[in-house]
Amino acid sequence: IAIAIGGGYAWVTGKKVAMTDMPQMIAMYNGMGGGAAATIAAVELLKAQGEVASGAPTGDRLNALGLEALNTHPETIAQAMGTDVAILAIIGAIIGTIAFSGSIIAWAKLDGRLNSNKLLPQQQQVNLVLAVLLVIVAVSVFNTDSLMPIVVFFLLALVLGVFITVPVGGADMPVVVSMLNSYSGWAAAGIGFSLNNSMLIIAGSLVGSS
């Protein structure tokens, strides 16, 4: 049902878009892809945090572990998800969230709704500080049993996506859209690994490498 609704809406709206407005539409759909990957990552992280809070596996992990679940008491998100899965989920979340907010800004600039090329003085230095903070918070998410680091993590990633894209001029926007498209693909591939979903891995890798 979801595929039918989404595909039908995209088909109807896509037919109405003029060729001159095609870059805006591509930027918007890039953002949706990144947002979808980030949302899946958020759900998985929140499920893991719920396991930590309850002191026992739930859902799919409970079914997978069976009787072993009785002796399993995860204390961090990394323990609840597994180290490799947690790393991939966090990487996918970062890339997907940046692709989402960055694509929204790209759409706004291409559509003439945003003309600013700088939000703050020393914008590049601010971006660097934000990136460092994001890595630090990502590590804390990996080792946390609390909800707050997850919230801060996604907020920082959203802001970083905006700050990275705003300084880019209109002439370079096609390059940014292409880069964000690649980000969306790699985000989907990362989430595919964390979910053990071959289709997401293949499709995401194809989009990312393109």
Over which residues does each language-model region extend?
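Hydrophobic alpha-helical hairpins/lids featuring a short glycine-rich hinge
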Residues: 26-55, 66-96, 100
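C-terminal ends of transmembrane helices
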Residues: 7-26, 103-117, 160-173
